[in-house]
Swiss-Prot record:
Keyword field contains Cell division: no
TM region positions: 19-39, 43-63
One Gene Ontology term from the biological process aspect of the record: apoptotic process
Xref: Pfam families: BC10
GO annotations of cellular component type: cytoplasm; membrane; nucleus
Protein name per Swiss-Prot or TrEMBL: Apoptosis inducing factor BLCAP
Keyword Cell cycle: yes
Family, similarity comment: Belongs to the BLCAP family.
Amino acid sequence: MYCLQWLLPVLLIPKPLNPALWFSHSMFMGFYLLNFLLERKPCTICALVFLAALFLICYSCWGNCFLYHCSDSPLPESAHDPGVVGT
């Protein structure tokens, strides 16, 4: 389970508040995960645990999924603040 310590922090990286950056963020995270899986070749158990955690986070639609934004979940309150989005 040593290889899992490099995968689990990826789930904790927050999505940007600016909706214009969501595509760039999801592409970066997808390429990072693909590169990690091809280069480090984690064990099967670690890969399955990570994919199960990623599936549960994205399926529950809590807003932490970096693959897509759920249409029924609202934007964060700070996303409407021009001072935050403009940074």
